[in-house]
Amino acid sequence: MEAWYRKGSIVAVSFNHTIIFADDKQESASFFTKLFALPEPVAWGPFLSAQLDHGVFVQFAEPGIEIQAQHYAFLVTEEEFDGIYQRIVDAGLPHWADPRMAYPGQYNTNHGGRGVYFRDPSGHNLEALTAPYA
């Protein structure tokens, strides 16, 4: 084990931002902010940025290459989940209770909370959950 790693220690590291590749950044950023009831995305350089809690940003960019689907999970409150799930249903979005998509049109009640999986316009697998899995 390398010297910089100390088992059991927690280092003061915070997550700041990530970039999600999109076929159409405006479409993906708008989908994301509407579904999660966030402020409208803001342009910053080549990105459209959506602000989350604790100063975290999700930035959408168009890389000009084929998009490889990724998984992004977002921890939300029970009240926020209610709104998100209702917006998914109202929009007629396909959604699942599990990442294998074996339980369509449902949400799960794993780990003492609720969770739902769905896809964004570029095919990324998004998840909204109310209790962390780990």
Predicted regions and their residues:
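A short, sequence-level motif marking secondary-structure junctions
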Residues: 62-67, 133-134
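Short glycine-enriched loop/turn motifs at secondary-structure junctions
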Residues: 12-14, 65-69, 109-110
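Vicinal oxygen chelate
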Residues: 73-121, 125, 133
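Core segments of cupin and vicinal oxygen chelate
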Residues: 12, 19-58, 64
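Short aromatic/hydrophobic contact patches that present stacked aromatics
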Residues: 17-19, 49, 57, 71-73, ...
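Hydrophobic pocket/interface hotspot
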Residues: 28, 32, 72, 88
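Conserved beta-strand in the GNAT
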Residues: 58-61, 117, 126-129
